Swiss-Prot record:
One of its GO terms (molecular function) is ATP hydrolysis activity. The gene is hscA. This is Chaperone protein HscA. The keyword Chaperone applies. The lineage of its organism: Bacteria, Pseudomonadati, Pseudomonadota, Gammaproteobacteria, Enterobacterales. HAMAP family: HscA (MF_00679). One of its GO terms (biological process) is iron-sulfur cluster assembly. NCBIfam families: HscA, PRK05183.1. Chaperone involved in the maturation of iron-sulfur cluster-containing proteins. Has a low intrinsic ATPase activity which is markedly stimulated by HscB. Involved in the maturation of IscU. It comes from Salmonella paratyphi C (strain RKS4594). Belongs to the heat shock protein 70 family. Keywords: ATP-binding, Chaperone, Nucleotide-binding.
Length: 616
């Protein structure tokens, strides 16, 4: 009998055949694609030897161009040349226009408030534009590797929310790519440096790209990459340096008109060129719109100093979350082209007390790490023992009675992760339960962020507390959340995948974390009060049902005592005295003990009625 050949689902039937995989750094300003060849990770250049691909797409009626050719058209055809589209991913049109009021594009809102860009090629959304960039990178990889890609790992900022991550996945699928995984950019850098240098200990990854800033505190130990804490700002990067310098040049040149898109582009191009030159020189000559002048590195440093300080404040918060001090950090990895700015390297070095690592090209390190991870995930390194653990930035939980938040997965828990908790019904005969998914660090619903709501129906009508509902939170490797609620006796269940239409800003995330610390004592007191009020309501509801059913078991005097105790509890439960509510609950319990005993005796007699002692 011949053997039946089998293989793992999704893997090649020829187990020793090398599969083609790539890592893609889908950046705000520039993008790269990398792969592993002969055991070495390397970025793939275009025909002219250029490794970076400008994240720019120029649209025309007859087609589109991506990269350098598109960027060269920016000044002549600004409205049809889309750049920094990553900043628009997962955001509403209102949010984009509030954040970036000077974007030179013709926007229209879709039916759900998401942005559509009106171009010569028609209405396009950020997902489509990102897909065109990904197609160009995939084509470069396929040509270089002489074959179609079996899978890719695409990097995203650590603080990208669910909508932004899902948008990135959608763009990849639109580009015809099989996504092996989305990988946080700082984590990709840790993979690149961890495998190359073999360092063990705490590492800070300072990632300042064109449009985003991320700081990650990682522990590297024996091949395990664990993210201890993350922080950052998804709306801060080298683009902001460029715009500040462009505005400064505008002022020096006396250019008041902001409506001329061609001049806007010339100013921005001049600012970018000056920024790059000032990384090596102390002064640079600028010639734009008929104006000539000189800009010094000191002037540039003054312009960007506040932004650099903002990144260091995020570093301090991340270190606090990780429970480490700056001196505990073994290495500081610099990622992103903007880390070439001398002031950035200087301030980061001063903050951590050590010279930052720049051994791997900061523009390429993320793509290289992604390529290494893709090579493993596609099955080319079955003997690899590398383990990668990312974290969620904010706690996830549920609303419970009294407006309280029950945390199911705490902040900075490594992902992928699944956690479950059991809940029960509050009222007799309750047949449905509303599941309200929350995100945040505070104790009360009003102080946290609502992620989603759904209902579980078909719960059997049992006494309060009789039904058992298991709620499971599952966060996958891409940071996407699924919540499932199941009634255990019947198996009836409902679920939801959380995909916010647009996300939470990193400033709000930092504020939520800060508030949880500032209001910790106040929140604990508020929670204790809410819990006592919920317990008071439960006791009173239960007592009302018991009195309705078995009031005949009480004398008039006993009934009066119970009614008085219940009235007192109802009154104090309206106030804010936790101790008074607790004492009133105890008093009701004391006054109803004999009543409860009689009800129990009566239930036993009813159960035994018509049965002999032998049957019992």
């Amino acid at each position: 009998m011949a053997l039946l050949q089998i293989s793992e689902p999704g893997l090649s039937a020829a187990p020793h055949q090398r599969r083609l995989a790539a890592g893609i750094d889908l950046g705000t300003t520039n993008s790269l694609v990398a792969t592993v060849r002969s055991g070495q990770a390397e970025t793939l250049p275009d025909h002219e030897g250029r490794h970076l691909l400008p994240s720019v797409v120029h649209y025309q009626q007859q087609g589109h161009t991506v990269g350098y050719a598109a960027r060269d058209n920016a000044a002549q055809d600004t409205a049809n040349t889309i750049s920094s589209v990553k900043r628009m991913m997962g955001r509403s049109l209102a949010d984009i226009q509030a954040r970036y009021p000077h974007l030179p594009y013709r926007f229209k809102a879709s039916v759900n408030g998401l942005p559509m860009i009106d171009t010569s090629a028609g209405l396009l959304n950020p997902v489509r534009v990102s897909a065109d960039i990904l197609k160009a990178l995939a084509a470069r990889a396929s040509e270089s590797l002489s074959g179609e890609l079996d899978g890719v790992v695409i990097t995203v900022p650590a603080y990208f929310d669910d909508a932004q991550r899902q948008g990135t996945k959608d763009a990849a699928r639109l580009a015809g790519l099989h996504v092996l995984r989305l990988l946080n950019e700082p984590t990709a850098a840790a993979i690149a440096y961890g495998l190359d240098s073999g360092k063990e200990g705490v590492i800070a990854v300072y990632d300042l790209g064109g449009g985003t800033f991320d700081i990650s505190i990682l522990r590297l130990s024996r091949g395990v990459f664990e993210v201890l804490a993350t922080g950052g700002d998804s709306a801060l990067g080298g683009d902001d340096f460029d715009h500040l310098l462009a505005d400064y040049i505008r002022e020096q040149a006396g250019i008041a008109d902001r409506s001329d898109n061609r001049v806007q582009r010339e100013l921005l191009d001049a600012a970018i060129a000056a920024k790059i030159a000032l990384s090596d020189a102390d002064t640079v000559r600028v010639n734009v719109a008929g104006w000539q002048g000189e800009i010094t590195r000191e002037q540039f440093n003054d312009l960007i100093s506040a932004l650099v300080k903002r990144t260091l404040l995020a570093c301090r918060r991340a270190l606090k979350d990780a429970g480490v001090e700056p001196q505990d950090v073994l290495e500081v990895v610099m990622v992103g082209g903007s880390t070439r700015v001398p002031l950035v390297r200087e301030r980061v070095g001063e903050f951590f007390g050590r010279t930052p690592l720049t051994a791997i090209d900061p523009d390429k390190v993320v793509a290289i790490g992604a390529a290494i991870q893709a090579d493993i995930l596609v099955g080319n390194k079955p003997d690899s023992e590398m383990l990668l653990l990312d974290v969620i930035p904010l706690s996830l939980g549920l609303e419970t009675m009294g407006g309280l938040v029950e945390k199911v997965i705490p902040r900075n828990t490594t992902i992928p992760v699944a956690r479950a908790q059991d809940f029960t019904t509050f009222k007799d005969g309750q047949t449905a339960m509303s599941i309200h998914v929350m995100q945040g660090e505070r104790e009360l619903v009003q102080d946290c962020r609502s992620l989603a709501r759904f209902a579980l129906r078909g719960i059997p009508p049992l006494p309060a507390g009789g039904a058992h509902i298991r709620v499971t939170f599952q966060v996958d490797a891409d940071g996407l959340l699924s919540v499932t609620a199941m009634e255990k006796s019947t198996g009836v269940e409902a679920s939801i995948q959380v995909k916010p239409s647009y996300g939470l800003t990193d400033g709000e995330i930092a504020s939520m974390i800060k508030d949880s610390m500032s209001f910790a004592e106040q929140d604990v007191k508020a929670r204790m009060l809410a819990e006592q009020k919920v317990e008071a309501a439960r006791v009173l509801e239960s007592l009302t049902g018991a009195l309705t059913a078995d009031a005949a078991l009480l004398s008039a005097a006993e009934r009066q005592c119970i009614d008085d105790a219940a009235a007192h509890l109802s009154a104090v439960a309206q106030g804010d005295d936790v101790d008074a509510i607790e004492q009133a609950i105890k008093n009701v319990d004391k006054q109803t003990q004999e009543f409860a005993a009689r009800r129990m005796d009566q239930s036993v007699r009813r159960a035994l009625k018509g049965h002999s002692v032998d049957e019992v």
